[in-house]
């Protein structure tokens, strides 16, 4: 048993270091939905060079979102002009309607020939987080290519998806492709600071037009390589849900005074005690209440003894595994709502008892809980009427999108993954513990999938929102190929025969 416990922590601690965790089924490989007439995803050398050069140019435009109130609007406007020049066929095709939404976001409507087919949507975001130059091997907005990699902020988050989607469409249109199924491309400009000015406005526009999507695909999970010890195979993970959020301000007001005659408790002391209680009293462990437990059982066959035995018998080892998951910050976030103190403000002068103390708490809500439940738990833990709670922002965890053999979006992603990446045998759904723009579209589809068709290893992952963000030229070209194939697969998709219980 000691050896078994020693093996598990290392495995569990890195189960998902990229903001997602797995759940679901691996399913058999199937290509029966493919049509006989397809445009092969074979690009000329000139086209392959153009693919990488277009991404380099996109990275060079610093479309930074600094805060909800501040973004580089000059760069956002420049980016709009850039994509017009980079993809002339897209912008001049009679099949494509382009609209600028909320000044800097973009909505493309690609008209299909069969109006009976429900449309879908491909998503990405134009904005990036700030990138101070310190520590970078190259300037963060240079888009330089070194040793087969393109460097720069947005190379993985999320200029790569913006450009890959548009480039795939450009290449299809150049080859006179006419889609059967209509689809949309939505490019938000403020995802890094909530998406309320971009994606939310696009969603409202589509809702006003009565659009209902079969599914959407946004950023999220990757094809993981080297993240899970003892598992040599790459694992493609498609996030089918994501955590909710609750931002709270805790505030204590007291009568100010001179520090020479202090009261028994100050506003700082009262608030500090409340915050300490929150840190020392974590939210309930929800392991078993979400898809993670099911996934571990599924992945059991991929591991050797003793891990496979544990994962096949969670009915017995549930308490051990759930406790192990708590030991690492990443895996802890997979099994519970997290509570993080992010700001603390108090004090005006060294000899003055402060009249006001404020702290800001960020909660990321597990899919098995609600905003109301978490708020009540916070109140019960603080347990002090002198501490006022103010909700600054909140939204519920997103519903879990279907991932069975009846789920069109999931099945199309799985089929395309296995076609473009034949080395990938394992495709599973997951939970995104970060937030994306998908939540703004929950009213127009129940199929929301988050997947970046790129292999990712721990070293490359460290560049996301960090230093030396980069993408392999070959991997990026394969991302374009993936979308090129995906659009065609969506046209040839055959609705599955309903299960007997659905008839």
Swiss-Prot record:
Record gene name: Pm20d1
Pfam families, A to Z: M20_dimer (PF07687), Peptidase_M20 (PF01546)
Knockout mutant characteristics: Genetic ablation causes tissue-specific bidirectional dysregulation of several N-acyl amino acids. Locomotor activity and resting energy requirements (RER) are slightly increased and decreased, respectively, in PM20D1-KO mice on chow diet, while diet-induced obesity conditions produce a marked impairment in glucose homeostasis and insulin sensitivity in these mice. They also exhibit enhanced defense of body temperature in cold, and antinociceptive behaviors selectively in response to chemical and inflammatory pain stimuli while maintaining normal thermal pain sensation and normal movement.
Annotated signal sequence range: 1-24
Binding site for Zn(2+) 1: 157, 192, 465
Keyword DNA-binding tagged: no
Further remark: Overexpression in mice blunts high fat diet-induced increase in fat mass and associated weight gain. Free NAAs represent the biologically active form of these circulating molecules, and the circulating NAAs bioactivity is determined by plasma protein binding.
Family (UniProt): Belongs to the peptidase M20A family.
Native organism: Mus musculus (Mouse)
Listed GO MF terms: aminoacylase activity; hydrolase activity, acting on carbon-nitrogen (but not peptide) bonds, in linear amides; lyase activity; metal ion binding; peptidase activity
Biological processes annotated in GO: adaptive thermogenesis; amide biosynthetic process; amide catabolic process; amino acid metabolic process; energy homeostasis; fatty acid metabolic process; lipid metabolic process; proteolysis
Chain residues that bind Zn(2+) 2: 125, 157, 218
Cofactors named for this entry: Zn(2+)
Expression by tissue: In addition to being detected in blood (at protein level), PM20D1 is also highly expressed in other tissues including brown adipocytes, liver and kidney. It is also expressed in small intestine, large intestine, heart and pancreas.
Gene3D superfamilies: 1.10.150.900, 3.30.70.360, Zn peptidases
Key words, A-Z: Glycoprotein, Hydrolase, Lipid metabolism, Lyase, Metal-binding, Protease, Secreted, Signal, Zinc
Name of protein: N-fatty-acyl-amino acid synthase/hydrolase PM20D1
Activity regulation annotation text: Lipoproteins are powerful coactivators of PM20D1 activity in vitro and NAA biosynthesis in vivo.
Recorded metabolic or biological pathway in which this protein acts: Amino-acid metabolism; Energy metabolism; electron transfer; Lipid metabolism; fatty acid metabolism
Cofactor stoichiometry and binding remark: Binds 2 Zn(2+) ions per subunit.
The keyword DNA damage appears for this protein: no
Source domain of life: Eukaryota
Function: Secreted enzyme that regulates the endogenous N-fatty acyl amino acid (NAAs) tissue and circulating levels by functioning as a bidirectional NAA synthase/hydrolase. It condenses free fatty acids and free amino acids to generate NAAs and bidirectionally catalyzes the reverse hydrolysis reaction. Some of these NAAs stimulate oxidative metabolism via mitochondrial uncoupling, increasing energy expenditure in a UPC1-independent manner. Thereby, this secreted protein may indirectly regulate whole body energy expenditure.
InterPro entries tied to this protein: Bact_exopeptidase_dim_dom, Pept_M20A, Peptidase_M20, Peptidase_M20_dimer
Residues the record marks as active site: 127, 191 (proton acceptor)
Induction entry: Up-regulated in adipose tissue upon cold exposure.
Compartments where found: Secreted
């Amino acid at each position: 048993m000691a050896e078994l416990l020693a093996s598990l922590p290392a495995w569990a601690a890195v189960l998902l270091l990229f903001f997602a965790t797995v759940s679901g089924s691996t399913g058999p490989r199937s290509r029966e939905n493919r049509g006989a007439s397809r445009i092969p995803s074979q690009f000329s050398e000139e086209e392959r060079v153009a693919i990488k050069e277009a991404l380099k140019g996109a990275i060079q435009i610093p479309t930074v979102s600094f805060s909800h109130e501040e973004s580089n609007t000059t760069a956002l406007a420049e980016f709009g002009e850039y994509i017009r020049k980079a993809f002339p066929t897209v912008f001049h095709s009679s099949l494509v309607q382009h609209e600028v939404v909320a000044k800097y976001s973009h909505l493309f409507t690609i008209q299909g020939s069969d109006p009976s087919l429900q449309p879908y949507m491909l998503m990405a975001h134009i904005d990036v987080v700030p990138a101070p130059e310190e520590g970078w091997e190259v300037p963060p907005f240079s888009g330089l290519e070194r040793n087969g990699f393109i460097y720069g902020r947005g190379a993985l988050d999320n200029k790569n998806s913006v450009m890959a989607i548009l480039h795939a469409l450009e290449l299809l249109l150049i080859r006179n492709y006419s889609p059967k199924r209509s689809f949309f491309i939505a490019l938000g400009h403020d995802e890094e600071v909530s998406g309320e000015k971009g994606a939310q406005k696009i969603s409202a526009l589509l809702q006003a037009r009565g659009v209902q999507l079969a599914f959407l695909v946004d950023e999220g999970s990757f094809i993981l390589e080297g993240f899970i010890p003892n598992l040599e195979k790459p694992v493609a993970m498609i996030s089918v849900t994501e955590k909710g959020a609750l931002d709270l301000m805790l505030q204590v007001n007291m009568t100010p005074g001179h520090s020479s005659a202090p009261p028994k408790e100050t506003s700082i002391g009262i608030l500090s005690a409340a915050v300490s209680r929150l840190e020392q009293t974590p939210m309930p462990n929800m392991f078993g209440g979400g898809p993670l437990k099911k996934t571990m059982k599924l992945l059991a066959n991929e591991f050797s003894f003793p891990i496979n035995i544990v994962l096949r018998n969670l009915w017995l080892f549930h308490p051990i595994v759930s406790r192990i998951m708590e030991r690492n910050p990443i895996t802890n976030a997979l099994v519970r709502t997290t509570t993080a103190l992010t700001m603390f403000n108090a004090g005006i002068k060294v000899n003055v008892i402060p009249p006001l103390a404020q702290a800001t708490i960020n909660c990321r809500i597990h899919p098995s809980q609600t905003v109301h439940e978490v708020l009540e738990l916070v109140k019960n833990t603080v347990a002090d009427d002198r501490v006022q709670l103010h909700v600054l922002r909140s939204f519920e965890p997103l519903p879990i999108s279907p991932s069975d053999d009846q789920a069109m979006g999931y099945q199309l992603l799985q089929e395309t993954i296995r076609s473009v990446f034949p080395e990938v045998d394992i495709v599973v759904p997951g939970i995104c513990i970060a937030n994306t723009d998908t939540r703004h579209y929950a009213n127009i589809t129940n199929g929301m999938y988050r997947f970046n068709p790129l292999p990712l290893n721990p070293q490359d992952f460290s560049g996301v929102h960090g230093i030396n963000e980069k993408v392999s030229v070959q991997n990026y070209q394969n991302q374009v190929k993936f979308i090129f194939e995906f659009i065609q697969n969506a046209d040839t998709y055959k609705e599955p025969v309903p299960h007997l219980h659905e008839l």
